[in-house]
């Protein structure tokens, strides 16, 4: 998780985790692994993520990894402007860090 915490610094411009995390430009990411896509109340998701939500799709580690490699390529129509994790950064490090946060932001 420590390596992932360093990677998350890049995400913090748009996302938050931890107790009291609020939506920013992007939704808060507490408990993202295993969470239904497009499900954070009060966040205005893209039509793409609203469709995934309606189908009951859930963020798994594998899906998140593919998404983070190329968000708009993996899910055309998403609002996320991030181009994707550089190849030298391991998505599983970031996922390990995100997994340390429960849905309520506690560890």
Curated annotation (Swiss-Prot):
Q: Which residues bind heme c?
A: 11, 14-15, 80
List the Pfam families: Cytochrom_C (PF00034)
**UniProt cross-references to SUPFAM superfamilies, sorted A to Z:** Cytochrome c
Tell me what PTMs the record reports for this protein. Answer: Binds 1 heme c group covalently per subunit.
**Keyword annotations:** Electron transport, Heme, Iron, Metal-binding, Transport
The answer to whether the entry has keyword Iron is yes
Molecular-function annotations in GO: electron transfer activity; heme binding; metal ion binding
The domain of life for this entry's organism is Bacteria
Q: Matching Gene3D superfamilies, A to Z?
A: Cytochrome c-like domain
What protein name is recorded for this chain?
Answer: Cytochrome c-550
**Species:** Ancylobacter novellus (Thiobacillus novellus)
Taxonomic lineage from the root: Bacteria, Pseudomonadati, Pseudomonadota, Alphaproteobacteria, Hyphomicrobiales
């Amino acid at each position: 998780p420590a390596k992932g915490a360093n990677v998350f610094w890049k995400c913090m411009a748009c996302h938050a985790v931890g107790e009291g995390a609020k939506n920013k430009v992007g939704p808060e990411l507490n408990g993202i692994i295993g969470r239904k896509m497009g499900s954070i109340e009060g966040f205005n998701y893209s039509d793409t993520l609203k469709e995934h939500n309606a189908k009951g799709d859930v963020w798994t580690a594998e899906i998140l990894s593919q998404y983070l490699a190329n968000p708009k390529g993996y899910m055309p129509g998403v609002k996320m402007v991030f181009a994707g994790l550089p190849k030298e950064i391991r998505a599983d490090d970031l996922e390990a860090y995100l997994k340390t946060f429960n849905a309520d932001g506690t560890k």
